């Protein structure tokens, strides 16, 4: 069965393609001589005009379309990295802001590497921009790097920070903000941090998300596939990608999420 692009996606592609077309019609000057347009001259001299492009992963693409009011269903056919011209460079959208999504990666310690130790902390803002991403030196000897699933290797320890630094920096970032995560208590426990329950948005506990797993805790991979039509964690995990996927899931259901939180926090009225 052939997958067809939606009309919105076709319009977007058409608009992007129009931006790359160059008109080569000659222009007559006042003296009747033909002028060579700048774009044509640059092509003749093999000069490439400065044009910043960025390669977006499926998650980055989904965040980009959400930011630009394009339906997620319009990008469902995108399974590989593609190149898009970024829309603007709003510095405010790169600041931490009100909402932060966090995800961590772990390595194995202890006999046979069965116990877990923190090895990476990644935090992204509401728009998916990375505001913190550091590898962390485990406090115990690593017996299993779990690279196939964690993406962490011994080389990453050359640029890693101490556990104390990771804990302090994360704590400062999260203070006063709403924390979004998937089974976020695992990440908080690993950092020995706590966060007000009223300021936590956990995608693993959201009822509409749990409905696809018969009320059980769904995996982030399953949620991304079902609701975003995006395949994540294809090989090794990336805590940045996982944090972005979690934030995007929250953004798609933010109004309902916030309403459910208000309902949970609403105290029952006292009866006389």
Swiss-Prot record:
Query: Could you tell me the Gene Ontology terms of the biological process aspect for this record?
Result: ribosomal large subunit assembly; rRNA processing
Q: Which SMART domains match?
A: EXOIII
Q: Which Pfam family name is an example for this entry? A: RNase_T
Annotated Exonuclease domain residues: 99-250
- Low complexity composition bias: residue spans: 1-17
The domain of life is Eukaryota
What is a single molecular function from GO for this protein? 3'-5' exonuclease activity
Q: Main subcellular localization, coarse class?
A: nucleus
Protein task: Exoribonuclease involved in ribosome biosynthesis. Involved in the processing of ITS1, the internal transcribed spacer localized between the 18S and 5.8S rRNAs.
Recorded protein name is RNA exonuclease 4
Originating organism: Debaryomyces hansenii (strain ATCC 36239 / CBS 767 / BCRC 21394 / JCM 1990 / NBRC 0083 / IGC 2968) (Yeast)
Q: What is the lineage of its organism?
A: Eukaryota, Fungi, Dikarya, Ascomycota, Saccharomycotina
Task: Name the encoding gene, please.
Answer: REX4
């Amino acid at each position: 069965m052939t997958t067809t692009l939606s009309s919105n996606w076709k319009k977007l592609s058409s608009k992007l393609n129009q931006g790359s077309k160059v008109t080569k019609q000659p222009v007559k000057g006042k003296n009747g001589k033909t002028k060579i347009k700048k774009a044509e001259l640059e092509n003749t001299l093999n000069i490439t005009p400065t044009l910043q492009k960025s390669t977006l992963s499926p998650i980055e693409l989904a965040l980009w379309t959400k930011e630009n009011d394009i339906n997620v269903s319009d990008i469902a056919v995108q399974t590989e990295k593609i190149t898009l011209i970024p829309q603007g460079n709003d510095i405010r959208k790169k600041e931490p802001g009100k909402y932060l999504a966090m995800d961590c990666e772990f390595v194995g310690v202890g006999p046979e590497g069965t116990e877990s130790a923190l090895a990476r902390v990644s935090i992204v803002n509401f728009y998916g921009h990375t505001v913190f991403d550091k590898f962390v030196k485990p406090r115990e000897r690593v017996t299993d790097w779990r690279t196939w699933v964690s993406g962490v290797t011994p080389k990453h320890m050359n640029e890693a920070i101490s556990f104390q630094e990771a804990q302090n920096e994360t704590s400062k970032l999260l203070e006063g903000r709403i924390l979004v995560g998937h089974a976020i208590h695992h990440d908080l426990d690993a950092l020995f941090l706590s966060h007000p329950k009223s300021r936590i948005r956990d995608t693993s506990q959201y009822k509409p998300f749990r409905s696809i797993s018969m009320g059980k805790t769904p995996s982030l991979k399953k949620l991304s596939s079902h609701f975003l039509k995006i395949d994540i964690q294809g090989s090794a995990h990336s805590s940045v990608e996982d944090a972005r996927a979690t934030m995007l899931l929250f953004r798609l259901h933010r109004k309902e999420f916030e309403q459910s939180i208000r309902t949970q926090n609403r105290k029952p009225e006292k009866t006389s």
